[in-house]
Amino acid sequence: HQKYNPFRFVELVLVVDKAM
Protein backbone atom coordinates (compact mmCIF):
# COMPACT_ATOMS: atom_id res chain seq x y z
CA HIS A 1 0.00 0.00 0.00
CA GLN A 2 1.18 3.50 -0.80
CA LYS A 3 1.34 5.91 2.11
CA TYR A 4 2.45 9.52 1.74
CA ASN A 5 5.71 10.05 3.57
CA PRO A 6 6.80 13.70 3.94
CA PHE A 7 10.28 12.60 4.93
CA ARG A 8 10.66 10.92 1.54
CA PHE A 9 9.95 14.28 -0.10
CA VAL A 10 12.49 16.01 2.13
CA GLU A 11 15.10 13.41 1.24
CA LEU A 12 14.38 13.99 -2.45
CA VAL A 13 14.79 17.75 -2.03
CA LEU A 14 18.15 17.24 -0.32
CA VAL A 15 19.37 15.03 -3.16
CA VAL A 16 18.26 17.54 -5.80
CA ASP A 17 19.83 20.40 -3.85
CA LYS A 18 23.10 18.49 -3.64
CA ALA A 19 22.99 17.77 -7.38
CA MET A 20 22.63 21.48 -8.08
UniProtKB/Swiss-Prot annotation:
Needed co-factor(s): Zn(2+)
pH dependence: Optimum pH is 7-9.
Coiled-coil zones: none
Annotated source species: Crotalus vegrandis (Uracoan rattlesnake)
One GO MF term: metal ion binding
Main location, first listed in the record: secreted
UniProt subcellular location: Secreted
GO cellular component term, pick one: extracellular region
Enzyme Commission code: 3.4.24.-
Quaternary state and interactors: Monomer.
Name used for this protein in its record: Zinc metalloproteinase-disintegrin-like uracoina-1
GO biological process, one term: venom-mediated hemorrhage in another organism
Cofactor note: Binds 1 zinc ion per subunit.
Assigned keywords, A-Z: Fibrinogenolytic toxin, Hemorrhagic toxin, Hemostasis impairing toxin, Hydrolase, Metal-binding, Metalloprotease, Protease, Secreted, Toxin, Zinc
Ranges annotated as spanning the membrane: none
Temperature effects on activity: Activity is stable between 20-40 degrees Celsius, decreases at higher temperatures and is lost at 70 degrees Celsius.
Reported regulation of activity: Inhibited by ethylenediaminetetraacetic acid (EDTA) and 1,10-phenanthroline. Not inhibited by tosyl-L-lysine chloromethyl ketone (TCLK) and phenylmethanesulfonylfluoride (PMSF).
Domain of life: Eukaryota
Known role: Snake venom zinc metalloprotease that possesses hemorrhagic activity (minimum hemorrhagic dose, MHD=4.7 ug) when injected intradermally into mice. Degrades the alpha-chain of fibrinogen (FGA).
